[in-house]
């Protein structure tokens, strides 16, 4: 029916994306599609013996296009014209360094084959040392415990540890990076045409649990706290974000295509 409305959900897992088309009024599943990340499937950009797991942003884009097209092809005629929303969930923390436009560095020719310019997958454990330093800083006597709302222990799987590890390891990425984006925030920014890193809407769930964001201390930890971990983090707080939004808030509008 022409007045039937639909939404599309995309679940980005470790190996693949699942697209789901749902009828808004009834919650009925109309069609699904699963597509595997092509580069990841080949084992590219990862070093298992080092617990180094990276994913290319092109993998995310290509499976987005393929899964949505296939799912819609399985729906009744006219469904695509009546899609009124899309939503994403992803594994985390899976951050990537971006330029001022919010583009992951791996999308640039000079970084296309550099794993440090790609998304650092949730299960990447290369930042064990950095996580230990964060825990030590947060738990020393008299310090504000910025891990208090994250279970009291900061993990090497999380945002700040991974960011600091890459900054220390890769001068080229360090020099080219303007900001950092979480996978769950980049996908909505991508499909809504966001062209500025500062305009990317940040999800409260990932920010609160992985990035030590909390209203109690005004958002992210203060710059002086970050810089005390390593001067390489100087300036990052202002280039990241202050506010976050909950999952019930729209971040933009769908383009016609």
Describe the residue ranges of each PLM region:
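N-terminal glycine/serine-rich phosphate-binding loop of ATP-dependent small-molecule kinases
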Residues: 1-108, 234-243
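A short acidic, often aromatic-flanked loop/helix-cap motif at beta-alpha or helix-coil junctions
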Residues: 40-41, 128-129, 250-252
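Gly/Ser/Thr-rich active-site cleft segment
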Residues: 12-14, 136, 140-257
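Short loop segments at secondary-structure junctions
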Residues: 25, 100-101, 125, 169-171
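Generic structural "secondary-structure junction" signal
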Residues: 42, 100, 123, 213-215, ...
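Active-site phosphate-binding/coordination module
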Residues: 44, 77-160
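Short, well-ordered alpha-helical packing segments
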Residues: 61, 65-72, 120, 131-135, ...
